[in-house]
């Protein structure tokens, strides 16, 4: 699993088979198949990741130089022993429905990864977080997890051990924020319709299952000025010959 910056994924589709221009600021991309899930902590497939990295963003993102750079977090500090990281969210962050984003959304998102009932397939990636492995295996309470929303714009991660790749890991979709008020309505199926608030450069406007998923530019994205596309249509054509004929 690799963290990918949203526009790297979009740039890549321009040189892949199954991609075509459908308008001046719109592209059509062949997703191939219907994503099994686009829940950040349940997804383990490329098709789901393609959608997720276009509609969501974590504390950090991966830049064009393939290195971590500030995403929703504008800055961070590390303790001298490397065991505590404090992230400061950008001012004015909002979800696609206009609701303010807070550090609690990130804390909740990370907690979902280690909730045993969710059986997150990539939870082991986050075992560097204090009590992460223990929470996932049910030997520690989620309240003991080393993730704290200090205030609305400050998130602290306490670690089990220093991790030189931690910033890279934080760009992965398993660390994306989540809205408790949305998820708790249907913990296992909340993302199935696509009608949920997003925090990335795009947001879902239509999902015709097994046919097409459409995303449009998210006006509330903090870096919206750099998003040059208005719409991306992700069609689902599994057969290569059919895909070639369609484009």
Q: What is the predicted function of each stretch?
A:
Residues 144, 153, 159-233, 239-242:
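Gly/Pro-rich hinge or "lid" segments in bacterial periplasmic/extracellular proteins
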Residues 18-22:
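Sec/Tat signal peptide C-region and signal peptidase I cleavage site
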Residues 9-17:
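Bacterial N-terminal signal peptides
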Residues 24-36, 74, 84-86, 106-109, ...:
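Short, well-ordered beta-strand elements
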Residues 1-8:
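Bacterial N-terminal signal peptides that target proteins for export
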Residues 88, 107, 121-181:
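Surface-exposed binding/hinge segments that line
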Residues 30-80, 111, 195-199:
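N-terminal lobe/hinge region of extracytoplasmic solute-binding protein
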Residues 74-122, 156, 246:
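Aromatic- and charge-enriched surface segment that lines or borders ligand/interaction sites
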